[in-house]
Amino acid sequence: KKVPARELTGLLAKERLETGRIYTMFVDHANEHGSWLDQVDTSNLCLEVNHPLIPINDVNDKDAEIGVCILAALNWLEIKDDEEMESVCDIIVRMLDALIEHQDYFVPAAENFAKKRRSLGVGVSNLAALLAKEGLKYWDTKAPNFVSRWMEKTSYYLIKASVEMAK
């Protein structure tokens, strides 16, 4: 059966709006711009972490890989300055990396993925409160640039911490 692309996109958007269940991932974009050497086939539900997969043939398959989410959130409202953001980002990266080594995994394929790939997902919380503290609303024209600057700093310090740990 063929479905017109616009109709399908409309149905997906409607379902997402009404249920919150559909997350759209652009696999081609992820493969073109991601850091993986292996092809990315999927992501976790919320799309923080892209996952190359090696399919499971059995629940005890020691050669397979399935993605797991190693996640944390940075509370932007509590960050006082760039020095504190750098410190908190460093702590988050080291904490999540330590978690990879110390947690119990439900199947060997999950442990394989986590320990081989070491994917970390770091989100943010309290964006609305930070905007309010700065006298901004989501729809203010200055809000996107403000959020972009904060996200760039967050990303920079997380990557810096990861690079330092890799050394």
Regions found by a protein language model. Name each.
Residues 1-2, 135-139:
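Short amphipathic alpha-helical segments with coiled-coil-like heptad repeat character
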Residues 1-19, 27:
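Polar, glycine-rich mid-to-C-terminal structural blocks
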Residues 5-8, 17, 64-69, 89-92, ...:
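Active-site-proximal structural scaffolding
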Residues 16-114, 124-134:
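Function-dense linear segments that define catalytic or interfacial modules
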Residues 89-111, 137-167:
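Internal maturation/activation junctions in enzymes
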Residues 116-118:
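Short basic-aromatic helix/loop recognition motifs at nucleic-acid
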